[in-house]
Amino acid sequence: MIRNDTIIAQVTCPGKSAVGILRVSGIHANQVAFAVLGKIPKPRFATYSKFFDESKKVLDEGISLWFPAPFSLTGEDVLELQGHGNPFIMDLLIKRILCLKNIKIRIAQPGEFCQRAFLNGKIDLIQAEAIDDLINSETESVVRASLNSLHGNFSFYIQKIIKKLIEFRTNIEASIDFSEENIDFDFNIFIMSNFEKLNDKFLKIKNIVSEGSLIREAKRIVIVGPPNAGKSSLLNVLSCRDRAIVTDLPGTTRDVLYENINIHGISCEIIDTAGLRETEDKIEKIGIQRSWEMIKNSDHVLYVMDKTISLEDQKKTSIQFMKQISSYNIQEVTFVLNKNDLVEDFCGITKIENLLFISISALTGQGIDILKKHLSNRQKDKSQEGLFIARRRHIHQIDLSYCELLKAQKNWLKYKNIELLAESLNIINKLLGEITGEFTSSDLLKRIFSTFCIGK
């Protein structure tokens, strides 16, 4: 897609720095090169250059890079000027270029370089979003997963499903167009076999994207338990600061407290909640209700108990809690036995009837490293090579596609209607195509790229 305008932006951060970089992209980039450099640099070579103003006086000097279309970031002619990172010099160069006569050039909008790369087929929409995720990464896991998406791992999975859908639909539509010809295989077995293969592919990618979403958006860990078990003390220890008020009075915490922390490279949102108990206090009741809401929306629950209670009560309490949350979609539950300093017992991990217990002391710090390692390892087990970043819109589209597949299978078993099946497969194809950008509205593109920085 060739545009009739040219864009320019500073791609390095504003402010003083050793190097400042300007990027120009569009059909007039060559004229900008002639005006500012006096020539077009050798393609894809770093060329030492002087940057001239309109009166041919030197504004700055540095490196120029020329990438002729279509072999560039955006697929258009691209000129990069790398000079000294003085904001005043950067502004003078930008003004110089914007004031060039007979050239339609303007400041780039946020994410417009990446948007042009997408529109010109240099990257798909998943890769464009991965660039934004990579820039905003705060942990090593997010960096590696973003790079996997940028390198096309996520797109590869989506394209594999789309390819299978097209192959399936082609055979279906062939049977519609040439229904009078004999088909040398059991048609129903063929269709059910394809449903099974597609179902396996969807379940695999649904599992991967749910893990990728956790990496991008941080693991939500909710601390719950009875009053005075040490929930707030645990929050303070994990966050390495006095985030919550701690007293000997039951019910001190009456509202939800949030703290974002990094545990061994894993981004986590730790949530402290009001103690779970029966109470007549209206304010405390509201806090307890919010505690249950947090539990429902958590990725990992840390149920804190006082280790001084009997083993029988520990077991009874844990089993009762698991029954209470049996209908919730919670991935992990860990029972934390606090106040180990009062019993001077083993500090570590134990299992009782498939329930996991970790003994700690929030007061002395005993077992905290073990707990942190447990929390990070559970996530790192899912964060190996091949995992990619997934956004909410990706998960939503995959869920819609999978629901349509299940619906198509149900309708086939009920009606055996080939036209209806072919149309369902076409719908699934379009839903998945919205993830990569093959079928995407301009409003969605605008919303996605508007979150990017101007230089990208």
Curated annotation (Swiss-Prot):
The lineage of its organism: Bacteria, Pseudomonadati, Pseudomonadota, Gammaproteobacteria, Enterobacterales. K(+) binds at N228, T247, L249, T252. It holds the Pfam family TrmE_N. This is tRNA modification GTPase MnmE. GO terms for biological process: tRNA methylation; tRNA wobble uridine modification. Keywords: Cytoplasm, GTP-binding, Hydrolase, Magnesium, Metal-binding, Nucleotide-binding, Potassium, tRNA processing. Its cofactor is K(+). It is found in: Cytoplasm. Binds 1 potassium ion per subunit. InterPro entries: G_TrmE, GTP-bd, GTP-bd_TrmE_N, GTPase_MnmE, MnmE_dom2, MnmE_helical, P-loop_NTPase, Small_GTP-bd. Exhibits a very high intrinsic GTPase hydrolysis rate. Involved in the addition of a carboxymethylaminomethyl (cmnm) group at the wobble position (U34) of certain tRNAs, forming tRNA-cmnm(5)s(2)U34. It is an enzyme of class 3 (hydrolase). One of its GO terms (cellular component) is cytosol. Homodimer. Heterotetramer of two MnmE and two MnmG subunits. Belongs to the TRAFAC class TrmE-Era-EngA-EngB-Septin-like GTPase superfamily. TrmE GTPase family. Its main location: cytoplasm. Mg(2+) binds at S232, T253. (6S)-5-formyl-5,6,7,8-tetrahydrofolate binds at R23, E80, K122, K456. GTP binds at residues 228-233, 247-253, 272-275. PROSITE patterns: G_TRME. Residues 218-380 form the TrmE-type G domain.
